[in-house]
Amino acid sequence: MNSIMLISDLDHSFDEIALQTKQKSHSYGRRLYTLTQGQKKYWLKFHVEQHNQVLEDSFNAELEFYRQNKISSSDFLVPYRVIDLSKLNFLNEMRQSGEGLFTLDTNDFFIKFSPENDLHEIRKQILLALNALEALHQSGWIHGDLKSEHFRRYLDTCRLIDFEQSQRVISPKKLLTATPHYMAPELFHGQPKSVQSDLYAFGIILYEWLCQSRLSAKTYHDWAILHCQQLQIKLPDSLQCFLPILDGLLKKKIDERFGSVTELRNAIRTINLL
């Protein structure tokens, strides 16, 4: 079933509306709302024209991503709908034009796990996340800005959100628009994004999830030093079986890194969990 059909019955009246935009983003023209309708909660994102061209272009790129994936398989997307903002009553007084993006509210996928979680369950979670990432790549797209919060739980599956920095696999652009926390070493050297840079970001996400802690650095330069020179992977003794996977995801040289989700998935299936 195409995800867009799942919220095709969306009414334009809501029980609760709350502005969630951070102050700095708001000043740049970005708007992010949560809206409830009955038992369902949605997110609405749009950009006010002529405030910040870079952010406006990024949002328009995300809308175009959804338009191009409307007919194709959407197994990696949360239920969504692109909507004419002029039809939303609560925006009438703002005289807001253009289009906005509705997405169904979903839970974080990479939540904290307890020590009681067995290794088979952890591997299952990783493979579910890879299903979404593989579907994205097979549709011909690179996410370009993967973060832990972009992996969402929908029913019994993992889905992806936030495609403002997405690019075509066959024609990536040399744009420094990723988040330094998750940037592959080659991106700091001006190389274009790729499937492998998505996999590197996934490696950082996976590493932090397994360790239940986050990497830290203060400046862009500090992140560059960390990813290009200083990153060392250590796992708790109970999770050592996943070390070869992280090693293959976080190779500093792109030609030594896993080349595809399929290659990564095959490596995961060889892990001895005994």
Q: What residues fall within each predicted segment?
A:
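ATP-binding glycine-rich loop module of kinase domains
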Residues: Y28-R67
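Short beta-strand micro-motifs within the conserved protein kinase catalytic domain, predominantly
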Residues: V78-G98
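Activation segment signature within eukaryotic-like protein kinase domains
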Residues: Q125-I126
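Catalytic-loop of the protein kinase fold
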Residues: H137-R153
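Conserved activation segment of eukaryotic-like protein kinases, specifically the C-terminal portion
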Residues: K173-E186
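Conserved catalytic-loop aspartate of Hanks-type protein kinases
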Residues: D198
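Conserved C-terminal C-lobe helix
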Residues: S238-K252
